[in-house]
Amino acid sequence: MNQLEMKKLAAQAALEYVTADTIVGVGSGSTVNCFIEALGTIKNKIQGVVAASKASEELLRKQGIEVFNANDVSSLDIYVDGADEINPQKMMIKGGGAALTREKIVAALAKKFICIVDSSKQVDVLGSTFPLPVEVIPMARSQVGRKLVALGGAPEYREGVVTDNGNVILDVHNFSILNPVEMEKELNNVAGVVTNGIFALRGADVVIVGTPEGAKIID
């Protein structure tokens, strides 16, 4: 079974958490694209979605699913999103698709965060296989970069990428994130940082892992 098939298994299993006549929060990325495709098969069951990226919005509309603005929704029953890495405590690194800030906003609206991944995304320590994305106000890029170096990281400017919010991304290598909650707070306190890709203060409630043996649910 290849990686795409495992992503589809996880995405399909997440449909079990979608209840009738609700608005669903949807993240972004390749695994979420599989979920959007699956959600299209039950689109008449739900009111619509709040999407965390313009790319996801576009795919949802192609499926004929109504997209709501986050400002018009007071809460969501569930938020479904992928991860670049996830640890046993259900904390994540996200932001490979540069949508981390909007993902945090929509996740904060949700009563339950369901993370869908294939088994390659599971790690013991965050930062093991994937650099940490940090969204930065453009004028602060160099200043933030120096601060990240002082903290032991090796930031790399993600050239040619502008976020949906008009900002830039620094991908920070060499971080072994042993205390994700404290690291998330510390980085978010750096002047010029919009947010960073550690999702520890608001981690996942349920993890659905696509494996060669089927979808494994961790709750």
UniProtKB/Swiss-Prot annotation:
**Molecular function GO terms recorded:** ribose-5-phosphate isomerase activity
Q: In which pathway does it act?
A: Carbohydrate degradation; pentose phosphate pathway; D-ribose 5-phosphate from D-ribulose 5-phosphate (non-oxidative stage): step 1/1
Task: Spell out the GO cellular component terms annotated for this protein, sorted alphabetically and separated by semicolons.
Answer: cytosol
Q: What is its EC number?
A: 5.3.1.6
Q: From the UniProt record, list the reaction(s) this protein catalyses.
A: aldehydo-D-ribose 5-phosphate = D-ribulose 5-phosphate
Record: residues binding substrate: S28, G29, S30, T31, D81, G82, A83, D84, K94, G95, G96, G97, K121
**Active site (UniProt):** E103
Q: Which GO terms describe its biological process?
A: D-ribose metabolic process; pentose-phosphate shunt, non-oxidative branch
Q: What keywords tag this UniProt record? A: Isomerase
Q: Does the keyword Repeat apply?
A: no
- Tree of life domain: Bacteria
Q: Which InterPro entries match?
A: NagB/RpiA_transferase-like, Ribose5P_isomerase_typA_subgr, Ribose5P_isomerase_type_A
**Which of the seven top EC classes does this enzyme belong to?**
isomerase
Q: What does this protein do?
A: Catalyzes the reversible conversion of ribose-5-phosphate to ribulose 5-phosphate.
Oligomeric and partner information: Homodimer.
Tell me the protein family, please: Belongs to the ribose 5-phosphate isomerase family.
Q: Which HAMAP family match?
A: Rib_5P_isom_A
In Swiss-Prot or TrEMBL terms, this protein is called Ribose-5-phosphate isomerase A
Organism for this UniProt entry: Haemophilus influenzae (strain 86-028NP)
Gene symbol of the encoding locus: rpiA
